[in-house]
Amino acid sequence: RIKITDGVIEPVPLAVPKFLSEIIAVKEIAKNISLLISEDLTKTGLFRIIPDEAHISNVTNFKASVAYADWKAINAQGLISGAVTIAKLKKQLCLDPRGCLVVKFKLFDIFAENNIFNNGQKIYAAEPGEWRRLAHKIADDVYFNLTGEIGYFNTKIAFISESGVKNNRLKRLAIMDYDGANVEFLTDQSDLVLTPRFSPNGSRLVYTSFKLGEPHVFLMDIKTRGSFVLDERNQMSFSPQFSPNGQSVIMSVVSGANTDLYTLDLRSGTRRRLTSGPAIETSASFSPDG
C-alpha cells in the first residue's frame, strides 16, 4: 500500500542578473528593476532565484550570445537578461524632458537553449519614475511564458485606509500596487467611504460614500480623480459592483423599508430593478459572462 501524504512542488530555478544600464543615470534603476522582478517571481512560490554570486557567466553585453553551459552548470532553467536607458521615442511621449525610461529584456530556456520570445526581445517604456510598473510588467511576461497563466504583478488593490483614535476612526479611499507600494489616497478624511470596486480595465472605481449624509454609490475616474454620484434619485444606495464589460453597475437601493438590487447602465443612465422581495438584497456581483 502507498500512503500519499503531501505533494511536493520544487520551485523552478531562474537566473536574473542585474539589468545593464546603458547610461550612468539609470544604474540604480536598472539594479532595482531586476531585484523587483526577482521578488515578484519568488513570492509566487513557483520560482527560486539563483543568487548572483553563484553565477559563472556575467552578463556584460545585452546582445552577446548566451553561455548556456555556464547556466546549466548552476542548474538554472531560465535566464532573464535586460538593459535600461532613457531615450526620446517617436511613438511614445513622456513628460520627463530627458525622455522615457526604456527597458528591453530577453527570456531564455536554458535546457532547450533558445530565446522564448519569437522576436528575440520585448521592450517597455514609461516615465522614469514608473520603473516599478515596468518591472511588474516584465514579471507578468515571464510568469505567463513559464506557467501559461496571466500574471498579476502589474495590478492595483483598492482599499479603505483607516487612521485616528479607536472611537473615531477616519476612513479614506486608497489604491496601491499589489505588493503594497505606491499608496495613493483618493479621498480625504471628511466623509465615510466603503466597498471600493475597480472597473474591469482598472480606470475607474465605484464605491459607497456618505458625502451627502446618507450612503450613495459614487463613480471615480482614477486618472483625473473626478467623482460623481451615480444615481441622483433621492434614495440610499450602496454595495456597488461593475459588470464584466464595465458598462453597467449593480448595487443595492433602499426604497422605503425595502432594499433591492438594481442595475444602472452607465451610458444611458437607465436603471433596472432586479428584485422586489421583502428581504434585504445586498453585496451582489455578476457572473463572468454577465
Q: Where in this protein do the model-derived segments appear?
A:
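Amphipathic beta-strand/beta-sheet edge segments enriched in Tyr/Trp
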Residues: 62-141
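Short beta-strand->alpha-helix linker/helix-N-cap micro-motif
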Residues: 3-67, 80-86
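Short loop/turn segments that connect beta-strands within beta-propeller blades
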Residues: 111, 177-181, 221-225, 265-269
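Hydrophobic beta-strand positions that form the internal "hydrophobic ladder"
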Residues: 157, 202-206, 246-250, 290
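A short beta-strand motif characteristic of beta-propeller blades
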Residues: 182-187, 226-231, 270-275
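Extracytoplasmic
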Residues: 9-17, 28, 32, 44, ...
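A flexible loop/linker signature enriched in serine peptidases of the S9 family
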Residues: 150, 162-172, 188-191, 208-218, ...
